[in-house]
Amino acid sequence: MQRGALSPVLMLSAAPEPPPRPPPALSPPGPGSAPRHGSARSGPAPEPSGGLAAALDSSLRAAVAFKAEGQRCYREKKFREAIGKYHRALLQLKAAQGARPGGLPTPSPGPTTSPGPARLSEEQRRLVENTEVECYDSLTACLLQSELVNYERVREYCLKVLEKQQGNFKATYRAGIAFYHLGDYARALRYLQEARSREPTDTNVLRYIQLTQLKMNRCSLQREDSDGGTGGPARNVVG
C-alpha cells in the first residue's frame, strides 16, 4: 500500500484527461500549470527590453553621426546635402523616442508606462534634445543660404529651437528675419528686439530692426493714404 500512497501523483497525471468535472486532486495541477504559463510569458520579456535598448542605442548613434556629416557638408558649402543629413538625423531621433513598450500610439492606456520616451536615461534625453536643437538650428542656417529661401520653414525650425531653448540668440534673430520676409513686421520686430537685448551691438540685428521699422512706417502711411483716398472722393461726390 505504500505504492498506493503514490496514487495522488498518478491522479495528477491522469486528472487533466477528463475535462468535464475537476476532482479535488486537480487543485495541485492548477498551480503547476500556472508556472508553465507564467514562464512562457516572463521568458520573452528580457528579449524585447534588450532589443529596444539596442535599437535605441543604434538610433542615437546614427543621429549623432548624421548630424556630424551634415556639419561637414555645411563647412564644404554643400547645403543641400547638409539639409538631407540633418533630416536623417532627426528621423533617427524620432525613432529613438519611439522605442517604448507598446509603441507610440498607446502610451496612455497602460498605467505603468512612463509619460516620456521609454527607456531613455537622463543623459540620453539630454543627448536627444541637444542633437535635435542643433539639427534644427543648422537647418535654418542651410535654408538661409539657398537661392530661394523657404522662410516658412525657417520660421518653423526657429520656433522649434526656441521651444527648447528660449535664450537661443541665433534662432531668435533668424525668426525675426523669417517673419520680416513673410510680411509679419510686428512679430519680426518683437523677435529682433529680443535678439538685440541679448546682443546689443550685433550690426545685422540692428540693420533688420531699421528695415522692419521702415516697413511698418510705410504700411501705416499706406493705410492712412488709402483711408484718406476713399474719404476724399466720397466728399467730392457729395459736394
Curated annotation (Swiss-Prot):
Positions of the UniProt region annotated as Disordered: 1-54, 98-121
Q: Which UniProt keywords apply?
A: Phosphoprotein, Repeat, TPR repeat
What Pfam family is a match, any one? TPR_2
Which regions does the record annotate with the repeat TPR?
63-97, 169-202
Stored InterPro entries: AIP/AIPL1/TTC9, TPR-like_helical_dom_sf, TPR_2, TPR_rpt
Source domain of life: Eukaryota
Q: Where is the composition biased (Pro residues)?
A: 16-32, 104-114
**Claim: Repeat is one of the keywords in the record:** yes
Q: Which residues does this entry mark as bearing Phosphoserine?
A: S7, S27
The entry sums up its family as follows:
Belongs to the TTC9 family.
Q: What is this protein called?
A: Tetratricopeptide repeat protein 9B
Q: Write down the species.
A: Mus musculus (Mouse)
